[in-house]
Amino acid sequence: MITRDYGIVDAWAMPSYPPIAERWNSDPKRAHGVALFGENGFGGMSIEAQVEEMDRWGVDIAILSAIVESDDVKISHEEVAECISKFPDRFRGAIAVDPRQPMKALKEIEFWAAAGFVNLKICSYGYGFDNPPNSKLWYPLYAKACELEIPVTIQVGHTGPLLPSEGGRPIYLDEVALTFPELVIIGAHIGWPWEEEMGMLAWKHPNVYIDTSAYTPSRYPERFVKFLNRRAPHKVLWATDYPAIRYDRGIGELAALDLDPDVERLFLSDNARKVFNLPPSSKAFTA
């Protein structure tokens, strides 16, 4: 048992109650990605059960993401908002929009940010080979996020679903960070097999961070762990991509990393609270 005098923040999670799970698992491209995670898969859990699991492992707040890819809505903003309404102290929302209809997308971002959502989520792989994160397709969204002062989480690294990985090369974020120095950018999913490139960007740019979603601690690349523990502990956010990574592994495997306690607190809580403008932790948790 480990007692922490702070609550953990999960920077990328998703609701997975049955209708969402059915939608997700019925998509062959997504089902392939689900299979890569082994026994957990995606789904079928009530939001109440999700909160119980958070309690058991000391997770105070999770950023719940809507998932919109092209014409396909896997998790709607309304579904995320319903979860937040049930547990307003435990969840915040992340926005996802189709950039091909820019005016509609900008209005949606404004609406959901006004409703309390704290993040904009971008997965460029849903828009083919020709729209990486530095494509002009995304620039209106970046400008709106700057205006609203919300961070943007951008998927980096290979894709689990059968969709293009090219847009996940972290170097594309270099141009975005230079063009929008006011924009807080989070490179999600570590960036493997280009994790050193992602680390370089987080080290170089004051406005660039990394999150660990979709990776259990036992699968963190060795050089990434050194980056976290020694070089830039203030630039990495803990995340799971829940339910793909459940908390028994996402938290249960942390001890093997042998992180300095001050680094662990930054990683598990303080960095995310800063980036997402969350309240300070007022709870102690035992897990």
Predicted ranges, named:
Residues 47-51, 77-84, 109, 138, ...:
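Generic structural signal for well-ordered alpha-helices
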